[in-house]
Amino acid sequence: IAKDALVYRVERVKEATPANAPILYQYGAFGQRLSKFDNVDQLFKHRRATVSLGYIGLYEVASVFYGSDWETNPEAKAFTLDIVKSMKNACEGWSDEYDYHFSVYSTPSESLTDRFCRLDAEKFGVVTDITDKEYYTNSFHYDVRKNPTPFEKLEFEKAYPEAGATGGFIHYCEYPVLQQNPKALEAVWDFA
């Protein structure tokens, strides 16, 4: 289904004409100047643009198989890394098949985390550590309910981008007011 959705997006973009966005297509923002009747697909083929597969709920998947405190379990961590690698490998195969760059994007998806969790709770009921918190965890992020320190969060999450975030990733930490302690942020920055 993910492949079908991404291919659908590619097909929709191919319907655009240079006149739809002249700055992008006619005036060179994409590195070429097309006439208003040219096919925009030539700008995206040969992996010149990316169509990305995002994901949520890796924490919840591991919780089903290993329990909700799986973060320190090496087998569970390897399992989740294998999931990310499998998504990356699928995207690489689709790139070869279609000659577009398909990638895995590990990023927050705030509106979907709530919506999908709500829909699943309606269908499957409230499940401890899965739907009871009313959201799914973004991509590979550490469970925020556990209040990890920025250092713990960075240490836990560091393997995931390399495992498969070919389309990029967003790493974030939440901090209290840093105006009184800018050195704390600098320490985290240096650690990262």
Where do the model's predicted regions map?
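Long, C-terminal-biased catalytic regions of enzyme "large/alpha" subunits
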Residues: 1-192
